[in-house]
């Protein structure tokens, strides 16, 4: 993954960017849409290993609260952020968004929404709306599915092989997972009272990110097999290369949604 420990879609501002540069650019792209000002408080829902929190403190001089359900991630992020030279408040909590009830100025969520149960989508949007002040902003970064109508309208053919790969992802990589469509986010935003200011799709950027992850895994094949197994190695290569193909062909997409509380 590199020093950032970013494990979501990178953002390639230049053709010569490496994987880690693309992760920093992705965090900056998301944070830059929030209108952050020094002294604000930013909530990161599903903060991962702390990459976005670190950049938010360093570049935007804000107080940060990260929440995650992973004990390992929370411990790593705390240790990472403790090294920053700042007077701003930094918290990383082992907590779900359902339990968070403090007012914040801005919210960012990168690569967490995909893991939420569909029936909880409206609750999340309502919670975010409630936490923010008037004029507050949320940046939601999520992988997206498409409707059958979208495939027909855009001439995208989905083969039997593609359907089998979808079954593989659902069974072995993200059990029980279901991706939202752009239309779902639009409806959720409207229903909760948000204004959807911008939809920024990054499909090609994720294909490139997945290609780079696969290349890194291939380059360390023997080491990866030694600490896991040949079966796990092959499963992850199938996942990375298959998903890269899906993003290239437009079967799946990924987007950043800028939401404003009026």
Region spans (language model):
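A short glycine-rich, Lys/Arg-flanked "PGG" loop and its adjoining helix->strand segment in the class I
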Residues: 122-137
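A short acidic, Gly/Pro-enriched loop at the edge of an enzyme's catalytic core
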Residues: 98-107
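Conserved class I S-adenosyl-L-methionine
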Residues: 39-46
